Curated annotation (Swiss-Prot):
Keywords: Cell cycle, Cell division, GTP-binding, Magnesium, Metal-binding, Nucleotide-binding, Septation. GO terms for cellular component: cytosol. This is Probable GTP-binding protein EngB. Pfam families: MMR_HSR1. Belongs to the TRAFAC class TrmE-Era-EngA-EngB-Septin-like GTPase superfamily. EngB GTPase family. Mg(2+) binds at residues 37, 59. GO terms for molecular function: GTP binding; metal ion binding. GO terms for biological process: division septum assembly. SUPFAM superfamilies: P-loop containing nucleoside triphosphate hydrolases (SSF52540).
Amino acid sequence: MNYTKAKYIMGAAKVSQLPEDTGVEVAFAGRSNAGKSSALNTLTDQKGLARVSKTPGRTQLINLFDLGDNKRLVDLPGYGYAKVSEAIKKQWQSEMENYLTTRKCLGGIVLLVDSRHELKEFDSLMIEMAISFDLNLHILLTKADKLNNKERAQANKMIESFLKTFIRTDKISYQLFSSLSKMGLDKLKEKLDIWYQ
């Protein structure tokens, strides 16, 4: 797949505003400061494709990018310490759940988790949701260039230990990743290529 062809299509506030539910979509999700926009820009080799905001949590829309052949990348709203009201946060969360549970063309979810921190409530929720709805999930442990080898091993172990608490995790995979050094970029592309087949 040629990810450099990605073109912005639209931003939707609600799932009902999305284009027809056909083809294949891969959704990127993550807390506001997990490096989601940077990862999308690195994947597509386009610096400004997904806006890297200085105010985390500004992605309030479901943003879609066309890859051709009825294949799309989806940037889900950043979730976390956004300076918005609880009511708006709840609205985002319900739209996100709606997207993940009703979108038939969803080929998989890439969940971005900051490798330097423990799993947050949102991360755990996303993993649990993927398992309960039998969705493909690939966890990117981002900002791994900032870790030494011991810390990288600890980040992998953290995910491994969490996944051990579930019976079925055959559709879940994880890897270290860095937008800055492009560490793990080829592995990410390989995973997406399978989902887009």
